[in-house]
Amino acid sequence: RMAGNAVRGSPTWQSRYGSLMQHMFSASNVSCEIVVDGKRRTIFKDVSLAIAPGEIVDLVGPSGSGKSSLLTAFARLNPRAHGDFVLQGHPASAFTPQQWRARIAYLPQKPVLLGDCVADAIRLPYTLAIRQSATQANGRKAKPVELLPDVSIRETLDAIGCADIDLGRAPHDLSGGQAARVSLARTLLTDPKVLLADEVDAGLDDENADKVAAILERAALNGMAVIRIRHRPPDGRATRIMRLADGMLTQIENESRVEISNGGGIA
């Protein structure tokens, strides 16, 4: 899926691109505890992970192992987790929470699309940013449609394989696959450095799941670092597959060793 037929994660890919890779994001000593029935339960402890620009890292593991908790920890959205996080050489303490989340985007499993039409739903981050911004020199604030006109949205959707999605369509009229792709497109338009995709292909058929995966692959080819939770068989797009189980994060060296549970998910 890359130029010269260098498959992601293969020795050829590593030899061609591995020496060029520098960490976009790293996390170390990440731990998470919750309280259940008055007792503390450790979800994971002292987990570490680093990812380079252009990488796709798949995160697999049994249900309840803490995969979503780990991604929300990376996004600084998990108050029960703590650790040391570095983005492009700068510690998390150098960023406000808003600055951090603008650069490290967390995409939840279920799309949340608000607005009268697809275009409005995609412009939502710009709408919120304008509300928080200062008034311009001319005494007015820019309108979301001025910052992100329909033509720009249309170009982006077309470029990532979403030509079938009508900007004027109501979000609640979208199919599950279309809603997932619109949600992903909205996130990509904010241009994050790292994308944390929390099983965004859940509930989709194979065709739509592959469309979502292709969009993530394009983002990675443009330099974005992508971590995606998956409960599907390996699709050859990941540079690495990491397994979270029993509170520990380990790398799966051979894709053929990824276990598929009876329910069809990756264990």
Name these PLM-found stretches.
Residues F25, F44-D46:
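Conserved structural motif at the start of ABC-family nucleotide-binding domains
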Residues A75:
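Helix-to-loop junction immediately C-terminal to a conserved catalytic motif
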Residues A170-L174, Q178:
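Conserved ABC ATPase signature
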Residues G83-P91, W100:
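Conserved ABC transporter NBD signature motif
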Residues D116-L147, S152:
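Q-loop/switch helix immediately C-terminal to the Walker
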Residues V60-P62:
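The feature captures the beta-strand-to-loop junction immediately N-terminal to the Walker
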Residues L195-E199:
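Catalytic Walker B motif of ABC-type/P-loop ATPase nucleotide-binding domains
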